[in-house]
């Protein structure tokens, strides 16, 4: 048994369509095998959902990570914007959730306009634009053996706010790459009042082999990514010493501000 799907961050109001749009969290336990023997998509986990603001009636949804298995929430910040795409003005929403893909959706219908990874993703190669589903790699669900993965449960982007500048047309994402090893917990039993992950978290510990540990440590990165949502590519990035940096502020004077875990204000 299981559940999850908490709405703990982004909730926005779209006054044009009189919609409340919110991002939905991960599955609990993380490992879908402990939630759903049928191995379904588990709606509405890891989804963006729109409801009528006046009645609460469901309008549409888009699921970023069907059958979530990795703690890949879609609760990260939802931004509303007007973008010119293929010569047409579109009223869109944008999100860079934990799973490492940057999404642009039509905010009236939920239609997927674009999706592309903004960091390295080992769990999925790309998003199928016909179905909107990520194309998972063979080892992604760690069904037979533990799987090395990027992003980790920390996410490619977490609760630290991204920002959008209409002046530059860029979205500024406090992104990170933190490797993780997912594997089944063969002794998992649900325990009320505890984190019920259903994965063996000890697999993610740093190995005793110092050479391997140093190699893994070198893979841990934090950066500002300036993302162009129209061309679907990175415009530039700024490297940080490590991950878990603060939210972004962009100004009309084309300045960027951000705090770091080391107490610096940039």
Residue ranges and their predicted role:
Residues 22, 95, 173, 257-258:
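Residue position within the beta-strands of beta-propeller blades
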Residues 1-9:
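Solenoidal tandem-repeat scaffolds enriched in leucines and small polar residues
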Residues 12, 79, 163, 249-250:
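Conserved beta-strand position repeated across blades of beta-propeller domains
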Residues 9, 76, 160, 245-246:
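Structural signature of WD-repeat beta-propeller blades
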Residues 16-18, 90-91, 168-169, 253-254:
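Short coil/turn segments that connect the beta-strands within blades of beta-propeller domains
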Residues 1, 34-74, 81-89, 101-149, ...:
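Extracytoplasmic/lumenal domain signature
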